[in-house]
Structure formats: structure tokens, C-alpha cells
Amino acid sequence: MFLDAVPLEPYSTLKSQWSNKRIGRWRDRVAVPERETKQSMAAAALEVGARVRLAAGDFQHLLEALARRGYQVVGPTREDGQLIYGEIGKVADLPVGWTAVQEGGTFRLEPRPDQALFGYGVGQQSFKQFLWPPHQILWQVRREGGGWRLLPQAEEVPKFAFLGVRACELQAMAVQDRVFLQGVHVDPVYRGRREQAFIVALNCGHQDKGTCFCVSMGTGPKATTGFDLALTEVLQGEEHFFVVEVGTARGAEIIRQVPQRMADQQEIDAGDRVVAAMAGNMGRSLDPAGIKEALYANYEHPRWEEVAGRCLNCGNCTLVCPTCFCHTLEDAMDMAGTEGERRRRLDSCFTVDFSYLHGGSIRTSPKSRYRQWLTHKLATWIDQFGCSGCVGCGRCITWCPVGIDLTEEVRAIRETAAGAPKE
């Protein structure tokens, strides 16, 4: 039922001036110490599936290696007490030594007793905004003579390296690949950005259990596919290091430029224990078995009316969701009527106007709009795209102002299903 991430194709890259100089220095050496020889041989042998040890103190080298390849590194930063995805140029840009405590309608950052680089769960943003911009000009026209001329759109495709991509976010990208790349109409903006993106995944650990239920959805906490490199942060005693798994040839090319060595079995086991501990510490659970049929059979369940009485119809759940893609189109002209453009703007199915057709809106009640969102996310999405629209990240729970919990609503409907005593 769940869609695996689309494999990333290797792309050719030019050797940087730094790399050429470094190669020249190696060739000019008369003798190479035995330790360096072994390290270079191990680096040369790196291939997909290899796992290496990267000391936390050498993490800056990974950022620099990505920058040398022309990538704009984007990852979590701390801004105004929130986790925000922004440009990462140095390790200090990360929320080092912070953790995120979250529950329904609650999110706050608190200091940690250690210097973990990734000791927090997901914030309100996802990487969707970089692959599928919330505002986009689709085309522009100009009046010429007796007609209109379509103006070319020459957007320079940004080259992002996404840092700290959780397994649930990898699944969200795979879901959006199904929407924007594998349908009848391919989205050229999404395709260009997705093909360029370098993915540094992060296996979850060292964080508050929060509102996540990725284990229930089969999407985490360990990244299994769709990445160039995957990190597992290990803190044990005085040791602080990363076990880095190579996912693609591009990933191997980058990690070769970073001080590292092959991870031994004890280090690999330590990383596996971090992920296993996280898997056993989920904040929520949801049984996906038969969920589509349960929702279809309870379209008029009284729970829809009850949750509508709490829902503010603010659309927060759709804005923070890493897979929601509802949008609207707007046409605009200049005052002279000689130039115009069509814009795509992120929208929400919780707005009254979203379902507007000639004569009025179809979903006029909060009940109908919440039911549409939840049923689409967990049921009709499966019919439409062959996978669930929910990846279990828990953002919709955390960022709901009144703390509506998707997992609780589904459980309530199941426990009082059609034919059972009503609430």
C-alpha cells in the first residue's frame, strides 16, 4: 500500500578547483603514511550500501563538500523559538543542543543536556516548499498586434541539498513523486527541482516521542530508500559520531571528500539501537489495516459532527502536511491590459471557496470539509495514487490550535462503527 521513494538518478558533476588541487598534492607526495594509505583505499572502495563513521567534530566537512559541488544546503535551524528550514553553512546553524517537545496544539524547544546536532523531531515546515513552491507563476502573456504572445519562463532550477530528511519526509517526497511525476501531467517545476536535489536523510533518535506515528504507517523511523546519504547520530558516553550509509553513487562521491572511516560492527550496532529505541517510543499509533473501508462505511457517522464543533477550519493541518497539494489558480492583468499572468497558489480544502463551482460551494459546512480532508488523506488517496496520503509525521496534531488528533478521530469512528451503538 505504501509507495517506496523513487530512486535518485546519478548526475554528472564537474570537478571543483579544490578537488584538482588536492589530487595534485597527493600525486606530488614522495611517501604516504600507512594510516593515510588505508584510509584512502577504504574511501576508494566506498559503494552503495557501505556504512562509514563520521566524527561529530568533522561534520562541517560534509557541509563544505556539498557546497563545493554547488549545492545550497537546506536544513533545520532555530529561529524565534521554532524549527525553520533554512540555509545551513556551518554546524552552528543547526539547533545544536536543543530538543522539541510537542503534543496536540503544543510545540516548544528546550535545551538538551548534550550537544546533539539532530536531537529533535520535525517542526511545522517540510521540504515540500522547496520542491513545490507555494507561489508560482505558471505563464505570462503580452498583447502584440491583434493577438497574444506567450512569454518564455526561464526559471533557473535551484540545486538543493536537503539535510536531516526524516524517513517520514522521504515517504512524503515519494508520495508527491506519484502526484507530480507519475501522472498524466508531469509538473515541470517539481521535476526540475526534484532531479537536482541531493538527499541527506536522518534516521530518527534522541528526541521526544511527540505526536509521531511513523511506525504505524510503515514509514520510519529508519530511512530505507530514496536518499544519497543517511545519517544515524550516536551519543554514548564521551563518544559522539554518525554512522553514515551510502545510498547512491552521488552520495559515495560526496562522502569520499569527508574525513571518515569504515564503521565497525560495534558502531553499526550502536546506530541500530538508536533507531530501535525510537521505534519503541512512538507518541501515537494508528492501525492502517482496513482504514479505507472503515471510513467509506461511516460517511454519516456522528463523530464528524462532533469534531466539526471543535475544528476552527483554519487549515493549519493542510499547511503543515508534507503531502497536501491543494492549490488554486489566479489570473492577473496589468492596468493597461497589455500583459497578464497565471499564478498557482497553495490553498486548503478547509476554505469555503476551495470547493466553489458556478452557483456556490459544494462543502459549505465544517463537518463536510473535515470529513473530506481526513477521508482523502487516509482513504480516497489510496484509490487515487495507490498509497496512503498520510506518512505519520504527526504535524497535523501538533499544529492544530485545538489539538484535534487524527488518530483519535479514526479510533472513535472505528469503535462506534456503522451498526454499533452511537455515541
Predicted regions and their residues:
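Short, positively charged and aromatic/hydrophobic N-terminal segments
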Residues: 5, 11-13, 27-29
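Iron-sulfur-associated redox domains of electron-transfer enzymes in respiratory
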Residues: 33-34, 38-296, 301-304, 335
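Ferredoxin-type iron-sulfur electron-transfer modules in oxidoreductases and energy-metabolism complexes
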Residues: 288-309, 327-423
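Extended amphipathic alpha-helical segments enriched in small hydrophobics
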Residues: 308-318
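Conserved hydrophobic/aromatic pocket- or pore-lining residues that grip, position, or stack substrates
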Residues: 321
